[in-house]
Amino acid sequence: MVAGAIEDTPREPDLTAARPGSSIRDTRGDRIFNAVNYVVLSIYLLIVLYPLVYIISASFSSPAAVTSGLVRLWPVDPTAIAYETIFKDPAIVRGFLNSIFYATVGTALNVTLTLLAAYPLSRKDLHGRGAIMVFFFFTTLFSGGLIPTYLVVRDLGLLNTRWALIVPAALSVWNVIITRTYFQSTIPDELHDAATIDGANDFRFLRDVVLPLSGPIIAVNALFYAVGHWNAYFDALIYLNDESLYPLQLVLRQILVQNQTNLKMTGDIQSMLARENLADLLKYALIVVATVPLLLVYPFVQKHFVKGALIGSLKG
């Protein structure tokens, strides 16, 4: 009787046979939804990827092919004449080195100041942190203006120096807010209490506990600041007169303007057409030269970027 009762007991359906690695069977609607997602995302990928492929292909094509519109996907009459023309100018190498300096030194200073500002503001026992945050946030609503900022930079003795592109943009309030929110969401008060009992002060706690746990938000800040420094153009145009201090973006602008000026001064029609074709080709090569360094850096911080950006901006 017992055996019969056990056999008559209804059994739960075996859902593990639905599909490997899942206990939930996809419905027809789920499959349609997934298919539509794949199609839409694939189309979006092609829309985003094609301009990049086209620019790279055009930069390696012949000037005549680019001007005639023969380049579609792959290089036509492959040549590296555009890159040879660019890197013959020593100003390009100097601009690269200057941009690397601005990006590395500036980013290191930016991240350091951001962490030192965000950590105290994340502590509930900081007296007056609400008023401090009001002052921080006020600067995001009202700026000092172009001319007053220029006068401040001049009076500080930073004009026409490398620090003119680093010190005025040493801190981003938005990044401070994101970092503060990250600390509040991921660093529990109990961890600070335990470190205090062990005799650690705030600086030691920040160095030995907070920083090792803050890899994602540090990567987010570093990427934001590095991209800003690498693309710096307007500040350099205002504060720098010495061409040896120009960042890459300003050097590339000079090359384009110089080619256009030389083109207008050319008297021979055939020479003018040749230089016009080369000028069009240089535009694509210059885009590649200015963009590739950032594309090479991003994959190394991508895994931290998504986590840090989401936690820092959504929680808290």
Where are the regions a protein language model picked out?
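A hydrophobic, multi-pass inner-membrane permease signature
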Residues: 2-316
